[in-house]
Curated annotation (Swiss-Prot):
Binding-site residues for 2-oxoglutarate, renumbered to this chain: 213
Stated name of the protein: N6-methyladenosine RNA demethylase ALKBH
Gene (UniProt): ALKBH
Names of the cofactor(s): Fe(2+)
Alphabetical keyword list: Dioxygenase, Iron, Metal-binding, Oxidoreductase, Virulence
Function: RNA demethylase that regulates the stability of mRNAs through an m(6)A-dependent manner. M6A is a modification present at internal sites of mRNAs and some non-coding RNAs and plays a role in mRNA stability and processing. Demethylate m6A at position A1935 within the 3'UTR of transcription factor ZAP1 and plays an important role in C.parasitica development and virulence.
Length: 224
């Protein structure tokens, strides 16, 4: 969103508490102001947090225009998240990630992750609502036109992914076609439904997570 809007980042107070957009109440007058009002309209905090925010990036910032990872030193990947992931999946260094925010009705089209300069595995962690995850053959060059993703029936595997599940795509699966055709409403675990309203904070956002799926998709950009 930073390409099209001036983001109203919350200010730090005198404590060491991390700041969050959840600091603003849903009915806040604070707006995301468009850089070009002729193209985009102002957005409220509620509009952004409930529907308009679809993804953020961590670590290496992918250049979506040129389909490459920039050569300069990337922002540091969050150490606590990297430590957890590299303990579970030691063969992949957590260098870049896309955090997707899904609401029931959202989908992710079939695609392949081929921009990384390494064949290290992809890590996908899910939180919140269940989703259907589809994975299909990666050798599209040997498939008939009718069998290619998006063209009728084809060989594929369909998995139901629940909160806390992890998928590690490596070896033959590393470059496979994959996507999310459906997010299942009302399937968020009870213990997550009230997040981020915990410990007396962000109470006005209670229930935000109830119809959300958050997917952390992590990859190593290049061999070290």
């Amino acid at each position: 969103m930073h390409l099209h809007y001036d983001l109203p980042y919350p200010k730090h107070d005198m404590t060491d508490e991390p700041v969050s957009f959840f600091t603003y109440p849903p009915d806040s007058d604070t707006k995301f102001i468009p850089k070009d009002p002729c193209v985009h309209k102002p957005l409220s905090i509620k509009q952004v947090m409930e529907r308009k925010l679809h993804w953020i990036t961590l670590g290496g910032q992918y250049d979506w225009t040129n389909r490459v990872y920039p050569g300069e030193r990337p922002p540091e990947f969050p150490r606590d998240v990297a430590g957890l992931l590299e303990t579970l999946f030691p063969e992949t260094l957590a260098q870049a990630a896309i955090v997707n925010f899904y609401t029931p009705g959202d989908t992710m089209m079939m695609h392949r992750d081929v921009s990384e300069e390494t064949d290290k595995g992809l890590v996908s962690l899910s939180m919140g609502c269940d989703a259907l995850f589809m994975i299909a053959p990666n050798d599209v060059g040997k498939m008939s036109e009718e069998d290619r993703p998006g063209h009728g029936e084809k060989e594929h595997l369909l998995l139901r992914i629940r909160s806390g599940d992890a998928i590690y795509m490596t070896q033959e699966a590393r470059y496979a076609w994959h996507g999310v055709p459906k997010v299942l409403k009302g399937t968020c675990p009870d213990y997550l439904e009230d997040w981020p309203a915990e410990d007396g904070k962000y109470e006005e956002w209670q229930g935000w997570m109830k119809n959300k799926r958050i997917n952390l998709n992590v990859r190593q950009m290049r061999d070290c």
